[in-house]
Curated annotation (Swiss-Prot):
InterPro entries: ProQ, ProQ/FinO, ProQ/FinO_sf, ProQ_C. This is RNA chaperone ProQ. Keywords: Chaperone, Cytoplasm, RNA-binding. Belongs to the ProQ family. Pfam families: ProQ (PF04352), ProQ_C (PF17516). It is found in: Cytoplasm. Its main location: cytoplasm. RNA chaperone with significant RNA binding, RNA strand exchange and RNA duplexing activities. HAMAP family: ProQ. The gene is proQ. GO terms for cellular component: cytosol. GO terms for biological process: post-transcriptional regulation of gene expression. The lineage of its organism: Bacteria, Pseudomonadati, Pseudomonadota, Gammaproteobacteria, Alteromonadales. The keyword Metal-binding does not apply.
């Protein structure tokens, strides 16, 4: 009897996608940009698969498309691919610029984190001074200038009546809002194409202006 146990760990779901769609999801080495709207294709292809849920698939797909390995592949001349690895058109410059900005931001954060965790070198002992008639004045080291605070972006909760097609918005996904464009509004369901190429369906309460 086939096991119906659901996969809940994101790494396990990614491993399942690598195995099931090896021409689309690349486990090692250089990846390929994914087709816009691939999540819908993935959900339909796995609709009868009891191992994964749409929620977990969305989390795994977001982890895959926000990795450094994936963001580096979003570059000029690269072709998007579908679940079977078939070409689906070249990348738009807007998506390339957004991916490179996300990559730089992520790398800068990682660099700052490594610097904060690095052990500080031990202070060297100053050599003994030769006695002089007058006491030598020691200059106090200048205090470092305070770091400028990061700009605070004040988002506004969107109302359904405020939203229109082709409007740029921010979608609440995790800790950081993700930018995208509204592609369709169906009653209370708003379809948003994120700048990473992923298309999702959310309610107005998840959209920020």
């Amino acid at each position: 009897m086939e096991s119906t146990e659901k996969l809940t760990d994101t790494n396990a779901i990614l491993a399942y996608l690598y195995e099931t769609f090896p021409l689309c999801f690349i486990a090692e080495g250089e990846t390929k940009p994914l087709k816009i709207g691939l999540f819908q294709d993935l959900a339909e292809r796995l609709a009868d698969d009891s191992k994964v849920s749409k929620t977990q698939l969305r989390v795994a797909l977001r982890r895959y498309t926000s990795s450094w390995r994936y963001l580096k592949c979003v570059k000029a001349g690269a072709q998007r691919v579908n679940l079977d690895g078939e070409p689906c058109g070249e990348l738009e410059q807007e998506h390339i610029d957004h991916a490179q900005a996300m990559l730089k931001e992520s790398q800068d954060k990682a660099k700052a984190k490594r610097a904060a965790l690095a052990p500080k070198p031990a202070a060297k002992k100053a050599p003994k001074k030769v006695a002089v008639p007058q006491r030598a004045k020691t200059e106090r080291p200048a205090k470092p200038a305070p770091k400028a605070a990061a700009p605070v972006v004040n988002y506004v909760q969107a109302q359904l009546t405020d939203l229109t097609k082709k409007q740029r918005v921010n979608v609440k996904l995790g800790m950081t809002p993700v930018a995208g464009v509204i592609t369709d509004i169906n009653k209370e369901d708003i379809h948003v194409q994120l700048d990473s190429g992923l298309t999702i369906k959310v309610r107005a309460e998840h959209i920020l202006l």
